[in-house]
Amino acid sequence: MPFVKVIKNKAYFKRYQVKFRRRREGKTDYRARKRLVVQDKNKYNTPKYRIVIRFTNTDIICQIIYAKIEGDKVLVSAYAHELPRYGVKVGLTNYAAAYCTGLLLARRLLTNLGLADKYAGQTDIDGEDFNVEHMGDGPRPFRAFLDVGLTRTTTGNRVFAAMKGAVDGGIDIPHSPSRFVGYDEESSQLEADKLRQYIFGGHVSDYMKYLQEEDEEKYKAHFSRFIKEGITADSMEQMYRDAHAKIRANPAHEKKQPRDGLVKKRWNRAKMSLKQKRDRVKQKKAAYLKTLE
């Protein structure tokens, strides 16, 4: 195809149509969104659920969302900043924390829907690929589709750790093991032991041991928060094992309690009641009459 220079004349600007705002901002892939949102026409009012996973510098966000005409609705959500409740106080954005957040989302959702006992998921974490199967007589498993947004879906990405946690928690997510840590492209096989190692933070503990031997100063600086919390390379796996058990025992969301003695500052005048307004009018009248005397 020959190169054609775009001539930006009057006709060009008259016919120009701007792209959607979120496309202009580089936030939404509308080609992917269309396929994740549009439901089969023979399913009528059945929502199409998707598991949305996003990463920030300090947090992991996992949500179950479905689309409506007026906008997307969030069914349930889980965040990595909730993990200190379950004993994971550091490393809230690593591979193991992503797995914990996905597991928390799944158990919270199924508890809210009354399916927690029927679909327990994978209780023995061995790193093998797992798929939720229909139990037969009872209700079908909750199905959601993975929404990674604009994340680059490379093998070993943390997005798939959160998805693995949600699947092991009991949510039916259509997937392939080809993007998990430990998958070998040449043999097309998943190395389950390596995936299990990452789920329990083994890669972090290996690096801790390496730094302790090679550079003590860098170890103290790099893992200062781990040292402060008393977490060692040997206690890492048990910390995540206990966290998984606590998440399964109580996945419910806890409201943040207000701090004692906290006084909120007002930057505007408080709204007066009717009684106060009438009293203010009386005072103004009295002050005006006093000036006339």
From Swiss-Prot:
GO terms for molecular function: 5S rRNA binding; structural constituent of ribosome. It is found in: Cytoplasm; Nucleus. Keywords: Cytoplasm, Nucleus, Ribonucleoprotein, Ribosomal protein, RNA-binding, rRNA-binding. Component of the ribosome, a large ribonucleoprotein complex responsible for the synthesis of proteins in the cell. The small ribosomal subunit (SSU) binds messenger RNAs (mRNAs) and translates the encoded message by selecting cognate aminoacyl-transfer RNA (tRNA) molecules. The large subunit (LSU) contains the ribosomal catalytic site termed the peptidyl transferase center (PTC), which catalyzes the formation of peptide bonds, thereby polymerizing the amino acids delivered by tRNAs into a polypeptide chain. Residues 264-283 have a biased composition (Basic residues). GO terms for biological process: ribosomal large subunit assembly; translation. Disulfide bonds: none annotated. The keyword Iron does not apply. InterPro entries: Rbsml_uL18_euk, Ribosomal_uL18_C_euk. It comes from the Eukaryota. Component of the large ribosomal subunit (LSU). It comes from Suberites domuncula (Sponge). This is Large ribosomal subunit protein uL18. Residues 247-263 have a biased composition (Basic and acidic residues). Residues 247-283 are annotated as: Disordered.
